[in-house]
A protein has these predicted regions:
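Short, glycine-/Ser/Thr-/acidic-enriched flexible segments
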Residues: 21, 26, 52-53, 86, ...
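C-terminal beta-strand-rich structural cap/linker in extracellular carbohydrate-active enzymes
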Residues: 188-201
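Sec/Tat-exported extracytoplasmic proteins
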Residues: 10, 23, 75, 83, ...
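Loop/turn elements at helix/coil->beta-strand transitions in domains of secreted/extracellular proteins
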Residues: 14-17, 40-44, 74-79, 130, ...
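Aromatic/acidic polysaccharide-binding cleft in carbohydrate-active enzymes
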Residues: 44-122, 135-140
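Noncatalytic carbohydrate-binding groove/subsite architecture in carbohydrate-active enzymes
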Residues: 1-67
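Carbohydrate-binding surface patches
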Residues: 127, 136-182, 193
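Extended hydrophobic-aromatic, low-complexity segments
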Residues: 29-30, 90-92, 167-171
Length: 201
């Protein structure tokens, strides 16, 4: 409501280049942006602050897939993390929250490890090019999350996150993609989460 009111003010609108969103609620609340996008389709949206939790299990790759996919599908042209590099305890502390690092440096061994958010970003960033469009992808079902991009050169990038649950006790999930009249099947790992990136030309 606040953003709609501000953009309705002509003087304010003339000074605004875009809207920075912080999605602190559930991933599904990203749909709140759609009403603003419908009223102001020329205003860019950016997701500018959301980072890992110091307890890795609090925000898994599956958790991040819901957050990142929904924010982008609802209009954000970028998704920014928060702390680039912290130790395993989330220090140096930047506030009262239990923030983790995008990358984590072990304070004893100096070994570098990577957060679940980093792992998900690695399935998007290297493949989705500047100027890509987000396309509607049909076929969502329980246990999978999808997002589909088309790069400026015509290449399509499909990112699939799976929670690892089995369709039946002995049957793994699979993704069947129809592209240019041909069907391609991708079996997904069973019993564990996974993120897969498929490229189509």
């Amino acid at each position: 409501k606040r953003i709609k009111d501000q953009l309705a003010d002509e003087a304010m609108r003339s000074a605004v280049d875009g809207v920075a969103w912080h999605c602190y609620g559930p991933a599904e609340e990203a749909t709140n942006m759609l009403e603003v996008a419908a009223l102001h389709p020329d205003v860019p949206f950016y997701h500018t602050e959301n980072g890992p939790h110091v307890v890795i299990s609090e925000r898994t790759e599956w958790w991040w897939a819901a957050k990142v996919f929904n924010m982008i599908q609802c209009g954000c042209s970028l998704f920014t993390s928060w702390n680039l590099c912290l130790d395993e305890l989330g220090t140096p502390m930047t506030g009262a929250h239990l923030c983790g690092g995008f990358a984590i440096v072990d304070s004893a061994t100096q070994e570098v490890s990577y957060s679940p958010q980093y792992n998900l970003f690695r399935h998007i960033g290297p493949f989705v090019k500047r100027g890509a469009r987000v396309l509607e992808a049909e076929g969502f079902r329980d246990g999978t999350r999808l997002i589909l991009f088309r790069n400026p050169d015509g290449e399509h990038v499909l990112v699939v996150a799976c929670d690892g649950s089995l369709v039946r006790k002995i049957q793994r999930r699979r993704i069947v993609v129809k592209y240019k009249g041909l069907y391609k099947t991708l079996p997904l790992p069973g019993g564990q989460w996974s993120v897969s990136t498929l490229l189509f030309r």
